[in-house]
Structures are given as structure tokens and as C-alpha cells.
């Protein structure tokens, strides 16, 4: 129940796809806590604002914002963005790097395999924990450029030199042809 959540300081959105951006949920979150800050990819803010969510900051790749002594950086990944058949790549997409004095966390959102993983490591260092997507990867002929399969997810963890990798983006929505893990 969304009403039972504690106050939320920040919500990050990776891209516009419906499985990553549920407007009714964001509207409810904003309604119960108008102080929540919504960090979104460039050009996606107008969608949230049109739904009544006003506390929105758009970010470009490598933009960093400081919130309560935490650094949050929007990082590039290999994906795409749209909400309709007519708005492909009109908004940006990406992952989120969270850094405090105690730890570094990386959430990759959706991504295909890319040299950006090594670049993220070179720019920001190794994450203590990386949330790496492993779902919606079959058939490879269609999904290779936008979703990691399990083997590529392992290579992403190696490229990032993360201390711990946690697989995500599987078993929630039946999006493609792979078997449920």
C-alpha cells in the first residue's frame, strides 16, 4: 500500500517505458509527499508535470546533483526511450549512480551490452553494489541492442568491477520469449 510508505526524498526514473514509469504510482507518491524530488532523464519532465507532479529535475548524462550529502549521477547506458509509436528517443534514458561517504550504488535501468560500463567505472570507480538487468533478452536478434542476457550481465559486472551484483528486471513482467528464471 503506497500510503504506508515512509517519506521518500528522491525518486529516480531510468526512462519512459511503461515498465519503468508508472504515472498513477508517481502521482500517488507526489500526492502524499509534495517534498519528494523526482529525477528524470532530459525531456521527460513535461510528462510528469502534465500529470500534476511538480517537483521534477531533468538530467543529462553525467549530470550530478547533491541531495542530503549524497551524490546522484545520471549515467549513459545502451537503450532507447518512448511511450508511444511516435516519440522514439525524444526523451533520454540511462542509469543512476548513488554515492555517499559509506557506499556507491549503481542501478543500470534497462541496457544492452556497451563500453559505457567501463566508462562508468573509469569515471566514478567501482560500485559497491550494481543492480544489473537480466530480463527481456529473447529473441536476441531483436533484443541484443537494448537488453542484457545473463552472460552479458556477468560481463557488465566484470567491466564495472563491482563488489556485488544483483540481478533485476526479470520475473515481474512477461515481456519477451525467455524462460522465467
Positions of PLM-derived features:
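Active-site metal-binding motif and surrounding structural segment of the metallo-beta-lactamase
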Residues: 1-39, 55, 125-131
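Helix-loop-beta element that forms the nucleotide-linked donor phosphate-binding surface
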Residues: 47-60
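Alpha-helix capping/helix-boundary segments
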Residues: 17-18, 44-45, 63
